[in-house]
């Protein structure tokens, strides 16, 4: 083992701005740009990352005019398994590392529009499970608490 921490990426966003925090040995904050942003285990929208480029290509082939349609296509894109060494793949499966999970999130103006899907494990071998009710509950509770706090100030 190299004792090197591979890290994690956190996405923090609201209706006006968003950032990715690369939680590695040297954390870094990167602003989201308007439009499609893709991240794998490297930098946000990394032009050297074949998986980011593949995802951008596959996600822009058709008109994705709703969050539901986008997530339906994205779940298929992220489940693209390695079939040959020369074919790009979204899933990594090596001896020393690999895809451990995948998350799809869509946020709307209202909490009821939120969609949260997660798979523990590589998405080509595991189905995305829907955790939207949990996310909607968290968002609604936060909104209620913020309104209550604003009313008491």
Task: Walk through the language-model features, giving the residues of each.
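N-terminal nucleophile
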Residues: 1-153
